[in-house]
């Protein structure tokens, strides 16, 4: 599903160059749930942005579903994200003058999903995330945690083959974290591929694998040892309390 070789990204500020991603090799199999962990500044968000076409690499190759994509135009990347890749941004990126309902439905409408079908899918996702009463609210009327859940619903509305999520539980309390991870668990069980950035070891333990980044390089790649039956129940894995 995801195949990366010798990936390099350098951030430049004036005459200063900082290696954000340093010759990374990575393979994520179709249907895997992979967590990416590491300290702040390790390159986690940069890696996700590169895999989603939101930033350009300075070297290496990115292949998605057997197709090389690192050289795609912005327009082709945008189409790929609409149809096949869901992205949950760390800072939400919701459209401020649109309601929650419109924010979630928009990606579906852009790829030609009939309005009635887009609305039904939106209602399903908002209900799963405890947001059905917020459908007519604007982002400014929501808490940070509510905005985060809306961003997740928007990323999932087109049932993407690949979900890239940057700290999707970062602003959530235990109850809402559990709701989000239950939804991610269901998405995973449907065969979707998930790559999730997190600082939380409990959240990472819900994944099949945990990749550790340090100074832009992979410092570890570990299979989660919990039995599949326990990984399938996020509430059990994380033992989250209300």
Give the location of each predicted region.
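ABC family nucleotide-binding domain
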Residues: 1-207, 213
